[in-house]
Structure formats: structure tokens, C-alpha cells
Amino acid sequence: MKKIVFLAPVFLFVALSCHKEQVAEINTLIPREIIDLGTVVTEDLPYQIWGKDAMDMFGFEKANEFDVREWEFDFGNGLFKGSNAYYTLFNHGGPHVDAPNHMDLGGGLDVYPIEKFIGPLKVFDVTSYPNGRTVPTKVFKDKVNPGDVVMIYTGYVPPQSEKTPPELITLSYEASEYLAELPVSAFATDAFSVFCTDDEPSVESDNVALLTAPIHFSFLSRSIPIYEELFNVDKLLEKENMLFVGAPLNIKDGDGMQVRPLVLVY
């Protein structure tokens, strides 16, 4: 009996030590901060981000539509009320991810493995560059590893009137090719698109998709997701040890879908 009594504190000490180690391991998985790169989806969100002029130019005559159906049932002890809804969403009007078939470059969202939507994040402030395809390769050279999610902060400001076209900063074709060839896991921006009409692409090709949308082509032709219209990217500047998570609804043949991306800061 004395031996058992003597050993009991030893077992308790070992058990508590193991518990502390497990707690320590769990704590290393809990982020210090979680930053939401999404926004509240409203019926007019696409117009807020694109501006009506740009929506009309591309032939998008409507934004989002919320059809809420309220219902009530009497089960004998009072009315039970609630609602269901049909949500018609413009899938590129808000924080979203592009799939290859957005530019006729392959399959839809369902071809992406789930691993494509998560990865270590590197954020770059490119607000000092002028509008257009102006962000050069040197911004990323030797600062990005294969498998990283690369995000740029452009300081995008939505059009302030219906007749004002959106202006944006995006990558040069050389920079998009550099990142895509590493390859990065995904590319992201706060601007409404990586597409730009401010200047001519610095590439010669017979491929219409490459000539028209070279930045999209670099990534989507290699099945690398593109995230656009992200919010709160400025809150990520100067932070390190970040993990990006941005999985969309897995829509069959979907060319894109709205996302609520999260960044976990460790």
C-alpha cells in the first residue's frame, strides 16, 4: 500500500506534465489575431466596387438579388415563423476567387484541390506605383517562396460616380510570370481586378487570352487561383507569420465565387 501511495504523486506529476505539453502544442496553433478580408454582401455590392459604368461596359446589367421568402406555421401552440431565401449573386462582385474557365483556360472551381485555398501569406505594399501594369518583378525577387500566397495592397478606391471608370495598379506581365513559374499557391489583390486596360501588354503572341488579359493568363493557365476585391489588406502590412485561408463554395464548373477570406496571424 505504501508503494502505491508513493507512486500516486509521480503519476500525477507525469500526467500534469503531459497535459501542459499538449496545451502548449494547442496554443501554438491558435493565432494571435484573425483578420477578415471579406465584407458584408449586399444587393448593390458589385456596383460599389466596380462602379455602374464598368458593370455596363462589360454587359452586366444587374447586381445581386435577395429573394427572401417568409413563412409561418401554426402547430396548435402558437405561430412558428421563419424564412428561407434565394440569393442571386454576381460572382465577381465582392471578394472572390477566379477559376481557369473565367478566361476559358480550363476547368471551374471544382478542379482546384482544397489545398489551393490555403497557404503561408506574403503581402506587398505597391501603392507607390502608378496605375496600370506597373508592379515589377524586383518587388518579389528573393522574397517569395514556392507555395506562398502572394497578395498586393494597391490602395484601390472604388469609382466615386457612375461615369468614373475604375483605376487600378496591377502586376507587369514579367512579374506575373515570375510568380506563376515559382509557382505561388495563389495571387491576391485589393483592386477590383488584375485586368487592366491602361496600357498595352508587353508580350507578342497569337493567343487572344494572353494578349487581352496577360495577368489572368499567367496564373489561370497554370491553375493558380486569383483573389480580387479583398478588403482590409492594409491591416496586414508590416505583419509576419501569416496563414491565408480562402475556400469558396465548390460550384460545378463555376468560373468564380465570392469568398470570405481570413488571415491567421501567428
Which residue ranges define each predicted feature?
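C-terminal motif of bacterial Sec signal peptides marking the signal peptidase cleavage site
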Residues: 14-17
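Positively charged n-region of N-terminal signal peptides that target proteins for export
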Residues: 1-4
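Active-/binding-site microenvironments in catalytic and ligand-binding cores
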Residues: 19-266
